[in-house]
Amino acid sequence: MEKKTIIDLFESSAKRFPSNPFLWEKTGKRFEPTTYSEVRDLVYEEGAGLISLGVRKGDNMALLSEGRNAWIIGELAMFYAGATNVPLSIKLEEANDLLFRLVHADVKYIMVSGQQLKKIRAIKEKLPAVRTIIVLDERAEYQDREMPLSEIRRMGKVYLGIHP
């Protein structure tokens, strides 16, 4: 039996069921669907944006977020860029526990939700190997080494325009 990766399985499903809902997320009082095709477009944009940012095959990236569409899309984008995801539980409250995992895994990039950002900010000065912290939620301002996910997507669109 041929071994299939998560990317293989996702691509197969996106080709077979492009208009079918893949993800559901509550916005206001209703759950809204996102189709396989829409998710694939977002994953391609984010993955290309990560490559444009400098993510290379084998780089370790961390993902610290509550369960949500951006988490799934972000993880798939990491895989498309060739990175390895170092998943982190939002239940990690002790700075030393989080710091240990990030340093031990030699994480170079972090994707983090707005709710979890304070945990990363509290330790980021002890993370010199981390090049960029990608914030999943828009904020009024960003600190050193932080950038919004929207910028990654913008970079991805430019990259895909040059490298279709």
Language-model segments: residues:
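A short hydrophobic/small-residue beta-strand
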Residues: 61, 85-86
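AMP-dependent adenylate-forming
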Residues: 10-34, 137-143
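Conserved ATP-dependent adenylate/AMP-binding module captured primarily in the ANL superfamily
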Residues: 92-123
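ANL superfamily adenylate-forming
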Residues: 115-164
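Conserved AMP-binding/adenylate-forming core of the ANL superfamily
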Residues: 22-76, 93-99, 148-156
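Short hydrophobic alpha-helices that are characteristic scaffold elements of the AMP-binding
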Residues: 75-81, 104
